[in-house]
Structures are given as structure tokens and as C-alpha cells.
UniProtKB/Swiss-Prot annotation:
Coiled coil: none annotated. Its EC number is 2.1.1.199. Specifically methylates the N4 position of cytidine in position 1402 (C1402) of 16S rRNA. One of its GO terms (biological process) is rRNA base methylation. The keyword Methyltransferase applies. Keywords: Cytoplasm, Methyltransferase, rRNA processing, S-adenosyl-L-methionine, Transferase. It comes from the Bacteria. GO terms for molecular function: rRNA (cytosine-N4-)-methyltransferase activity. The lineage of its organism: Bacteria, Pseudomonadati, Campylobacterota, Epsilonproteobacteria, Campylobacterales. It comes from Campylobacter jejuni subsp. jejuni serotype O:6 (strain 81116 / NCTC 11828). InterPro entries: RsmH, SAM-dep_MeTrfase_MraW_recog, SAM-dependent_MTases_sf. This is Ribosomal RNA small subunit methyltransferase H. Its main location: cytoplasm. One of its GO terms (cellular component) is cytoplasm.
Length: 310
């Protein structure tokens, strides 16, 4: 079986979860099963719940992981909703979310993620109603400016939005290739990433509501308050990493009083656990040589030891 995607930070993920023995492991973003396959092999007593919203990825992974069929349950769902769909919440001992786009999705022409694509789609869930085509051809100039500024951190967001609106007034923009030509190939000041790459990333975030989905998922976990459970999240965008970092920082604090208050009034017992990774884990030099797409990957991990489930 040809594997269409190389899992990022595979060794680092295995290291984070190396001490897991029994219970359930939730792979929130199964993709093509690389992380789950390695963990299934190394943890024979763990049971797995594998989730993905991409039907193609799910079908592939069912075949790839067929030897473990008696230990794994598959769910098609966005990862922000998966906690509502599982029955073993109290037995969760490990949770992994790799929230990047797979190589298969990037390289698949019809999915419209790549700047070289003949399509303009970018939906991770093909059943979603809004695609990049609708956003590029129907959003107002102000809405497009906001997307490029907030999600792409592009200084000339207004200019890019203006160019798009001008071109679509002549004819609808139908392909990623066409959009790429409109945006241009220049770099964003001194950043290594091209302006078009940042703009495409911003559009993808809007199409899939990626930041909202991440916040919703972390909010559900905060309400769930797992016990004796390790959470690891791999992100590929600075905005996503910032969200994860801030949630972990919040969860690790005992005191949740306003910083302006001189003395603690909350009981000083609100910590959900400890941050495992003092700083984000990045790909090694060896991995970068094998898989250049791992260059943006950042993993953070948190241990929920909320034994009293306050």
C-alpha cells in the first residue's frame, strides 16, 4: 500500500505517549494513520478512537489499520465535535490532534489547496457548503481584507483584496492558479514565506474555520476536565500555536483571579494539570531533510492530572 502522507514529529509523538499502558487513546485527526499505526504497534493494551472529517483519509486508514480492527473505532467528524460522540471520556489516557493539511490534500489537484491547482476549493470536509470559490467570488472587499490581515498577517491585505475584487468583476475566479497570479509571487517583507502562500493559508483558515474549531475543541476539553490524560497538539500556524499555548498556560494555573486583585479569592485550586513541553517541539534536522513540510510543525503537550475533577 502506497502511503500518501508522511506523519510529522512521529518520534516526538511516540516519546510523549511512551508511558501509556491501558485505557483509550483518541486520535482526533487520523489523516492517513501514520501516528496511530506507530502507537498501536507500541501500545498493545491501548484501545483507539480514530476521528477524521475527510472521508478519503478515513477510508484509506481503515484499510491501513485493518490488522488492529479489534482495537480501533472510526468516527467521521470534525475534531471539535468528537468529544460529544464518544462514550469512554473517563477512560481517555491520550489525545492527539495534528491540525495540519496532509500532503495528499495539498497535492490532490481537485482539492484546490495548492497554488498550482485547477480548482478553488480548500474544504477539508467535502460536505461543507462554503469553499474557497465562494469566499473569493462573493465576500466583500472588507471581508477579504480582514481575512488576509487577521489570518495571513499580510501588511498589504487591503491591496490584495482590491486586486481580487477588480479581477472577479471581469470574470469569476475559478482556479487556485488564477488566484495565485492575481496575488503575486513576492515575499512578505523579510519573511521567507511568499505572499501567495500566506494568502492561501488565510483563505483555508476561513473556509474550514480552523481557529474557531481549535478553540471549540480546547473549550470542550476544559469543560470535560480529563483525569490522568496526556494531550498533544501539532499546529502549523503561529496563530494556532498561540491559541494552544494560551490555553495550556491557563489550565496550569491554580489561581484564576483577575491580575489586578492583590490577594487570591478563587481558592487557588483550579489547575487542571501541568504543561509537559516548556517550549514547542519542532522537527529535527534529520526530519527536515526527509520532509520539508515539517518545517512549520510545532507540538505542545499537557498532562491532565485533575484527580479530584474539580
Amino acid at each position: 500500500m502506497e502511503i500518501p502522507h508522511i506523519p510529522v514529529l512521529l518520534n516526538e509523538v511516540q516519546e510523549i505517549f511512551k508511558n501509556l499502558k491501558t485505557g483509550y487513546f483518541l486520535d482526533c485527526t487520523l489523516g492517513f494513520g501514520g501516528h496511530s499505526e506507530a502507537l498501536l504497534k507500541n501500545h498493545p493494551d491501548l484501545k483507539f478512537i480514530a476521528c477524521d472529517q475527510d472521508q478519503q483519509a478515513l477510508e484509506f486508514s481503515k484499510k491501513r489499520l485493518k490488522d488492529f480492527h479489534n482495537r480501533i473505532t472510526f468516527i467521521q467528524s470534525n475534531f471539535s465535535e468528537v468529544l460529544e460522540k464518544i462514550s469512554y471520556k473517563e477512560e481517555l489516557r491520550g489525545i492527539l490532534a495534528d491540525i495540519g493539511v496532509s500532503s495528499f490534500q495539498l497535492d490532490n489537484n481537485e482539492r484546490g489547496f495548492s497554488v498550482n491547482s485547477d480548482f478553488l476549493d480548500m474544504r477539508m470536509n467535502q460536505n461543507s457548503k462554503i469553499s474557497a470559490y465562494e469566499i473569493i467570488n462573493t465576500y466583500t472587499k472588507e471581508q477579504l481584507t480582514s481575512i488576509f490581515k487577521d489570518y495571513g498577517e499580510l501588511h498589504d491585505a487591503h491591496f490584495i483584496a482590491e486586486k481580487i475584487c477588480l479581477e472577479r468583476s471581469k470574470n469569476p475566479i475559478k482556479s487556485a492558479k488564477e488566484l495565485y497570479q492575481i496575488i503575486g509571487k513576492g515575499k512578505q517583507n523579510h519573511r521567507k514565506i511568499s505572499k501567495a502562500t500566506l494568502a492561501f493559508q488565510a483563505i483555508r483558515i476561513e473556509v474550514n474555520q480552523e481557529l474557531k474549531v481549535l478553540k471549540d475543541f480546547l473549550g470542550h476539553l476544559e469543560n470535560l476536565k480529563p483525569k490522568n490524560c496526556i494531550l498533544a497538539i501539532i499546529s502549523f500556524h503561529s496563530l494556532e500555536d498561540r491559541i494552544v499555548k494560551n490555553f495550556f498556560k491557563k489550565w496550569s494555573k491554580n489561581c484564576i483571579c483577575d491580575e489586578k486583585i492583590m490577594r487570591c479569592e478563587c481558592g487557588n485550586n483550579h489547575s487542571l494539570g501541568q504543561i509537559i513541553t516548556k517550549k514547542a517541539i519542532s522537527a529535527s534536522k534529520e526530519e527536515l531533510l526527509k520532509n520539508s513540510r515539517s518545517s512549520c510543525a510545532k507540538m505542545r503537550a499537557f498532562y491532565f492530572n485533575n484527580l479530584d475533577n474539580k
